[in-house]
Amino acid sequence: MDNVANNDVDVLEKQAAFLSSALPYMQKYENETVVIKYGGHAMGNLALGQAFARDIALLKQSGVNPIVVHGGGPRIAETLKKMGIESRFESGLRVTDEKIVEVVEMVLAGSINKEIVALINAEGEWAIGLCGKDGNMVFAEKVHKTVIDPNSNSERVLDLGFVGEPVEIDRTLLDFLACSEMIPVIAPIAPGRDGKTYNINADIFAGAIAGALEAKRLLFLTDVPGVLDKEGKVLKELTVTEAKNLIKDGTISGGMIPKVETCINAIQGGVEGVVILNGKTSHPVLLELFTEHGAGTLIIS
């Protein structure tokens, strides 16, 4: 020990202090389900991906039941471009035809999903890759998106093709995996009762899974630090009512609106709390769950 430099001792002491201070939070989440939506630019960074996998492994070792739901939009766009498949857009939304949904399923369920599974397994845990089709876990229906036509100022329904929303969730498989000490990693692909395959927004998919399981927490790893006030500062905690008011007064705007609305729907569906946090930082999951002040914006009922 005499050979260890003082700064090394300081680092070790800080690590020990963190572990000690984390104990009550580990106890708080023991045997609880935490759904983590993994997405954003962090997915394209190997070092952050490995850190994320280690965090998930640590959650499992701490007695938490983590469930990972992932997206993969940038990789899908990249693959479509490589394959020479052009995308068509309606009011800024991608139309997913039969050819594109096959590529989406290949990329999400066949490529990205298995990469995340491999990273978690490399940390000594048992992760298993799934999508909504497995065990009839999720059934979807076609999304009917209504927009205002700028020319006529009247409503019209967009046909986005094979874009769906979850309407039925059977938790049997997920409950079984929790009892068998496995970590589910789920791609947001699901069948419809019509026999077709649907691509589902990963945020909405994660919210539906978390609601069906009455999860203790749903974490959205994003490219932003949380919900910001008008001065650009992170709001540490919001109630559903406060979040709705911030949408009304324009504080919450743009792409953050559908994300916060998904948080609200998840809470109304049975989730105790939903957190929006920055997935581009080191160990955001541990900082949120195992520290006093958390790492993002917590939305509660």
UniProtKB/Swiss-Prot annotation:
Reactions the enzyme catalyzes: N-acetyl-L-glutamate + ATP = N-acetyl-L-glutamyl 5-phosphate + ADP
Localisation per UniProt entry: Cytoplasm
This protein's record includes keyword Amino-acid biosynthesis: yes
Pfam family, one: AA_kinase
An example Gene Ontology biological process: arginine biosynthetic process via ornithine
Keyword Cell cycle (UniProt): no
Signal sequence bounds: none
Record keywords: Amino-acid biosynthesis, Arginine biosynthesis, ATP-binding, Cytoplasm, Kinase, Nucleotide-binding, Transferase
The EC number(s) this enzyme carries: 2.7.2.8
Site (Transition state stabilizer): 37, 259
Database matches in InterPro entries: AceGlu_kinase-like_sf, AcgluKinase_fam, ArgB, Asp/Glu/Uridylate_kinase, Glu/AcGlu_kinase, NAGK-C
Family annotation (CDD domains): AAK_NAGK-C (cd04250)
Cystine residue pairs: none
Top-level taxon: Bacteria
One Gene Ontology CC term in the entry: cytoplasm
Pathway listed: Amino-acid biosynthesis; L-arginine biosynthesis; N(2)-acetyl-L-ornithine from L-glutamate: step 2/4
Residue sites binding substrate per the record: 72-73, 94, 199
PANTHER family named among the record's database cross-references: N-ACETYLGLUTAMATE SYNTHASE, N-ACETYLGLUTAMATE SYNTHASE, MITOCHONDRIAL
Function statement: Catalyzes the ATP-dependent phosphorylation of N-acetyl-L-glutamate.
Family the entry assigns: Belongs to the acetylglutamate kinase family. ArgB subfamily.
Name used for this protein in its record: Acetylglutamate kinase
Origin species: Bartonella bacilliformis (strain ATCC 35685 / KC583 / Herrer 020/F12,63)
